[in-house]
């Protein structure tokens, strides 16, 4: 371990690395790493660290995803009673604002998520994301006006904007390589559980006008749990290493991986950090530097994810099912169950089939299901056929989304981003996600009225086909590779 520490000192000392001859430096580093490479197998027999050490930390971080899913769906069943109680019933613009204001707040939160995560660390960033979600949900639950509701939703959105970025960072950085995909997918399961929970919680709102307030109060409990339990979790070793706290990073690796894997993990960090400036990442490096390709892939994936229309399904599925003559409560629960089922499949397959295969299959399945829904709203099928194709197509759409297009983009981006730029790159890409999400939420009902279901589904389906082509041509496979191996491979290919 001493050789790794010496190499670390050379690299991280202020400007010392600029005076070290390149060949001498690389030779010293290679000698330090010769006997401490991380295993790349897929099980215990291959010498991998136990996944049980990191699991509790991932579960606590997943509370952010649970809150994300809950707030994503909390207005689905309750929007009608909220509009009646607060006096804007029938105003589609106001109803759209209740949804999209949250997304506007999420955009603001995502813009600053990288600065927060790099500035105060991942653990404190989680706690800072919980605070506006607690305050915002409390404001929404107790308000008597539309403006109060919008303020509360905006504050919740800020927390939602910070949370997913930090979750993707943290889970990626504390997970062993051989289960990183599984853990990344498990956060999507937490999102599904939160979404399904919001749908169940909202069922009484149909008969109890004031029940929607209880639905908002419920969300303060997991937010408070996140803030408290994060005190018991470890900090990201990558963040500690970047801050010059190598000894603490070693201690964290020992907790996460076990003592016999600390040397290998530290050597990998040193290798990925060699030659990099220790200063904080700059936005210009992402937009004009050698990491632009990473940001381009991530931003495009998030954009296509939203342009597929998935969140329009979650926000307004009650309205869509009502038009099809299906009881919204039971249909929405079916949506939540399909989402959970697809996410479970993703957990099983993520580290077996890989990210790229799941993305292609997911977007292809979504395109097919949108085609079925478009046919349902033509004059071709019988009334029963219309019901079967519209509802069945929507459920297939959600199932397909949850197997790849849902969990993969944030996981993939957190894997392919260079360590020093990871938080900033995620913030930029998630900002793109929230901007498009905002406009989809704001304009979906109006577009449904003016364009009709057939044309709208055709537009969403077109973007799914574009996504299949884009993934095939641009996305690299990261299954089973350490973060440092991925980073070195990508950066060397762009030089």
Swiss-Prot record:
* Gene Ontology molecular function, alphabetical: transmembrane transporter activity
Keyword Chloroplast included in the entry's annotation: yes
InterPro entries named among the record's database cross-references: GLUT (IPR045263), MFS_dom (IPR020846), MFS_sugar_transport-like (IPR005828), MFS_trans_sf (IPR036259), Sugar/inositol_transpt (IPR003663), Sugar_transporter_CS (IPR005829)
Organism, as annotated: Arabidopsis thaliana
Q: Could you confirm whether the keyword Transport appears in this record?
A: yes
PROSITE patterns attached here?
Answer: MFS, SUGAR_TRANSPORT_1, SUGAR_TRANSPORT_2
Q: Which Gene3D superfamilies match?
A: MFS general substrate transporter like domains
Q: Which NCBIfam families match?
A: SP
Question: Topologically, how does it sit relative to the membrane?
Answer: Multi-pass membrane protein
Q: Organism's domain of life?
A: Eukaryota
Recorded GO cellular component terms are: chloroplast membrane; endosome; Golgi apparatus; trans-Golgi network
Organism placement in taxonomy? Eukaryota, Viridiplantae, Streptophyta, Embryophyta, Tracheophyta
Which UniProt key words apply to this protein?
A: Chloroplast, Membrane, Plastid, Sugar transport, Transmembrane, Transmembrane helix, Transport
| Similarity-based family | Belongs to the major facilitator superfamily. Sugar transporter (TC 2.A.1.1) family.
Q: Which PANTHER family match?
A: PLASTIDIC GLUCOSE TRANSPORTER 3-RELATED, SOLUTE CARRIER FAMILY 2
Its function?
A: May be involved in the efflux of glucose towards the cytosol.
Please state where this protein is localized: Plastid, Chloroplast membrane
Transmembrane stretches in the record are 55-75, 97-117, 131-151, 154-174, 183-203, 214-234, 294-314, 330-350, 357-377, 384-404, 425-445, 451-471
Name recorded for this polypeptide: Probable plastidic glucose transporter 3
Read off the SUPFAM superfamilies from this record.
MFS general substrate transporter
